[in-house]
């Protein structure tokens, strides 16, 4: 029987993993129903990889709890202090991502921060990053400086801090191994930062379960700073054990920013194509995987038939 592995995204430290899994499965069930599928995966059918507390503790320099399987408002006056505490490498990463998101939002060209990350150091780099974050707050719908700070902190730590990457990767590797009792295939659904983790693990794995579907809604893999960090470690590839890769995106989701087209995420000649459908995410900010609405229905990527439909096909 094909199993389901779910990998969450950014900024979920301190949350109850069982409640998060229930939300994901609730939204996915709604999406499957909308797609005409009779399937309703339950906790018994899925492994939810929760690394939120592990990532938070590793980033803060403490002893991490284990990876388990089962947006804040920013005071503009606090931005210089928050940004100034970041190391130069993370500052450059933050500035690169902020500028690319601002370009994607088509902000006014006369208010572009006057410097670029390359070669900028010290106070000038802090000032440029603070200016870019202020512009994000002003011009980018659905994204705040606080959200972007958290996203870049988490993604940068995963991409550039070996101890963070090893710990989080190990949790997903264990989930992939534990999801099957033999050679059963595994469907992987990975949202936001979780898609970076899933890609990194699957692209680097040798023997392991077949993955009939890798689903990466709202992925930041197409953001240049993220893609280039991955490509600096190993060439970009279509993971060998993945049969189908679907990467849905709402064009208003500026934390995902780009469709995973060959121009944005180039793969070797002859590689299978990544399917990149455009969808409409009704969740606030257009980025959430699962979002409960007041009327008891679901929003978020997983609640959409175009997103959940491929999961139903792969699980049958």
Regions found by a protein language model. Name each.
Residues 1-52, 56-61, 118-189, 193-316:
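Lipid deacylating catalytic domains
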Residues 98-129:
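Proteins enriched for Cys/Gly/acidic motifs involved in redox and nucleic-acid/cofactor modification
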Residues 43-110:
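N-terminal accessory alpha/beta regions
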């Amino acid at each position: 029987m094909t199993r389901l592995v779910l990998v969450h995204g950014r900024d979920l430290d301190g949350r109850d993993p069982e409640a998060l899994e229930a939300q994901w499965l609730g939204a996915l069930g709604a999406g499957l129903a909308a797609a005409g599928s009779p399937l309703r995966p339950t906790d018994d059918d899925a492994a939810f990889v929760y690394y939120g507390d592990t990532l938070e503790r590793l980033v803060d320099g403490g002893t991490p709890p284990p990876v388990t399987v089962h947006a804040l408002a920013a005071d503009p006056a606090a931005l210089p202090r928050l940004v100034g505490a970041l190391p130069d490498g993370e500052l450059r990463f933050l500035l690169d991502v902020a500028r690319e998101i601002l370009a994607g939002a088509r902000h006014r060209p006369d208010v572009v921060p006057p410097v670029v990350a390359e070669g900028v150091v010290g106070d000038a780099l802090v000032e440029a990053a603070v200016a870019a974050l202020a512009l994000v707050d002003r011009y980018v719908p659905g994204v705040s400086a606080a959200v972007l700070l958290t996203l870049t902190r988490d993604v940068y730590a995963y991409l550039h801090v070996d101890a963070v990457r090893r710990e989080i990767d190990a949790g997903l590797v264990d989930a992939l191994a534990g999801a099957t009792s033999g050679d059963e295939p595994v469907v992987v659904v990975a949202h936001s930062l979780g898609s970076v983790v899933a890609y990194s693990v699957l692209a680097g794995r040798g023997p392991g379960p077949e993955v009939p579907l890798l689903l990466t809604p709202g992925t930041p893999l197409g953001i240049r700073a993220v893609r280039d960090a991955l490509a600096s470690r190993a060439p970009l590839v279509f993971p060998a054990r993945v049969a189908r890769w679907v990467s849905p995106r709402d064009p208003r989701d500026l934390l995902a920013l780009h469709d995973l087209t060959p121009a944005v995420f180039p793969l070797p000649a002859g590689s299978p194509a990544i399917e990149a459908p455009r969808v409409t995410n009704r969740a606030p900010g257009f980025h959430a995987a699962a979002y409960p609405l007041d009327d008891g229905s679901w929003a978020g990527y997983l609640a959409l038939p175009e997103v959940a439909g491929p999961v139903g096909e792969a699980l049958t």
